[in-house]
Amino acid sequence: MSSSPSFRPFAMPLLLALGCAGLAAPSWADDGTRRSYEIPAGSLGAALTRFAGEAGVSLSVDPALVSGRSSAGLNGDFGVEEGFARLLQGSGLMLQPAGEGSYTLLPMPEEGSRVQQLQPIAITGQGSGAAADHYAGGQVSRRGGLGMLGERDFMETPFNLTSYTSEAVKNQQARTLADVVASDPSVRTTNPSAGRFEQFSIRGYSLYNSDVAYGGLYGVLPTYSIDMEMAERVDILKGPGALLGGLAPNGSVGGSVNIEPKRAGDEPTTEFTAMHASSGQLGGHVDIGRRFGDDQRFGLRFNGVKQSGDTEWDHQSLERDSAVLGLDLRAERVRLSLDLGRQERDVDGPMERVGLNAGVKVPDAEDIHHNFAQPWTYSRAKDTFGALRGEYDLSESLMVYAAAGARRGDYDFLRHAVQLTNDAGRFVVSPRAFQREEEVRTATVGLRNWFSTGSVGHTLNLSLNRFDMTFDNSGARYANGVSNLFDPATLPEPVTPTAADNPTHTRSVLSSLALADTLSFAGDSVLLTLGARLQRVEVDSSEPGEPDQRYDERATSPALGVVWRTTEALSLYANYMEGLTQGQTAPETASNAGQVFAPYRSKQVEAGIKYDMGNLTSTLSVFRIEKPAYYTENGYLRPDGEQRNQGLELNLFGEPLGGVRILGGAMLLDAELTRTANGSNDGNRAIGAPILNANLGVEWDLPQVQGLTLTARAIHTGAQYLDPANTQKAAAWQRYDLGARYAFSVGETDVTLRASVENVMDKAYWASANVPDGTATGLTLSTPRTWLVSATLGF
């Protein structure tokens, strides 16, 4: 077994970041004007605390007064006292001024009674101004989506949740989801950039694009790559989330990602961004947002993107086009939204993973200087999608909601695998045409009720989900050729198929019913979530000449989460989650291609600490996740034992010093195979699971030049095994990025210029050996040095 990779290059920056004392964000005092607020429904104490903080006023109250009480939240423009009155409706409490900028709460007097003065204590601090949802530094949002539990502040969440803002996405010049997750130490991209598709790993387990939710709905977003210009927020939840969002279509258990769609803000948005990437990628992005009608209740947000040109690799080009329209209505009791989108992505010469036959040594990535995919290979993906959502407040304590989404995807590939047969880099080119059509229909309905029993507050959630997906695969095979990884040969484009693949038709229906109750104790300082989801997995797969395969499995998955806010700055949390996952399907490269395996259970136990110092937050968590493992033997995919990943995570984000922002962390991972066939691989490390991942990104606003920001990022990924026998190993790697941006105004136009260089040292390395269960093993090659330049004009 190998020794642990060195952590030395990252130790000092991380220790310095941990040692930085938070500097409180400045508040602004109430000036008597109405301001815009968006306070989520939940416990009354939390709602009042947040509102007072955003309004920049002081509120003092006896904790016993608000314990166990709930609030329907607040959304719109309000004055300070008007906002307090709305939050307090039905609570039996009243607001009383206590001096300039200060207030207290008293019980509503009964008729003929005298009010008793209580001894108050302060429960609120500084306000955060207009960007209330953004944590200090603006890169991470305080609130994130938790599916049926709604949106919550990260300090009140019994999970490891990080939500990246659209501001962070823009400043990273992120084009797809792979660019955003590069900032997270627990997440890695596991397929080549500008390949046929994007895939990821979270906590050492694979995450498919099809398991990325869109406003809480699975299966709506494009299957193979997701453009980021549509995203208002990117929520990354570590660990299984079956209770929260239902069954993930492809069974990702290491974590989940939710893309929150953009909405029109109170201020008009009109932005155009011109983009350029090295080797000729040119493009533009338009972002327009407006609100209309009485109280600006109607909103429209449009994002359109077009980018095309050559990439960093020879004979490779990429074109992406997307258009997403978001409409919304916000009234006193009703909130509606509709999102419609179209995305197209064409790649010529897409890179492939590099597989190795048994006994072949891992090649040196530095010796690869050319694109080893044939120039006639291509990937064509077209997705049309939409989602409709609605919420209605039946009363101040009861809300019902519903959402429905749909997508149609059409995909066409001409590709070949890259499987090395010797140490000299020889591989057989086996061209294959592959067509796939997907249709998804998904829906959820639910209700949320706030009430109290004695001194205990309750937030009760009931949710019913259904996901229905059909897909049809077809294809053809062509005559083989021979090429070399280090000296690729250009072969003739295939014309006449030598064999046709049997068409397959598969339908998956995932349905579930979930009930959860979040109980609040001790003045909302302790939040206990108890829940369970009754799940059903139905799979029906057919292929001409083969017997139909059908599965209909049911299971109940319990969940528990607890948060103890020992102080406003410190939260302790723990959770236990289970999930039922649709079984793996043998890939087209397997001898038993198309075979569908039975659904399986996964389990997670996690505990952690969250420390919010005002302008810097650090989280530390330990976790253990167990799930069945699969392996390929003599060309056949088979289930084999269990994979157990346990680890330690550190996350850091914020602005510890004025004008200095950090974003990063580390993950130590012990990924072990157990109960394998005949015990042959027991105790070995799982495929593609590095011992150590570490990230550190820093931004510095130069005080000498107003508007100028310098950026830097370092990424470390430990060594990884390519095979379960642990005989083939890819070395650890580091990547360094540098950048700058300059914001200024020209008349009435706001201008932001951005420039960055990814992989400054232009190092070649094997970025990942992680592959999903049921997929042929392979290595992902790094992307060469990449220049990104953009100019954003705000009118």
Feature map (PLM): residue ranges:
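Acidic/polar loop-and-plug regions of large Gram-negative outer-membrane beta-barrel proteins
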Residues: Q307-T311, V324-D393, A406-E438, R477, ...
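Structural signature of Gram-negative outer-membrane beta-barrels, strongest in the C-terminal barrel
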Residues: D328, E438, V456-N461, N465-F467, ...
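Surface-exposed extracellular loop regions of Gram-negative outer-membrane beta-barrel proteins
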Residues: D346-V360, D468-R477, A559, V563-E606, ...
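Membrane-embedded beta-barrel scaffold of Gram-negative outer-membrane proteins
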Residues: R389-D393, M399-G405, G409-R415, A598-E655, ...
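Conserved C-terminal beta-signal and adjacent last beta-strands/turns
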Residues: L460, A574, V605, I687-F795
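Gram-negative outer-membrane beta-barrel transporters
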Residues: A522, V622-E626, P639-P724, T792-G794
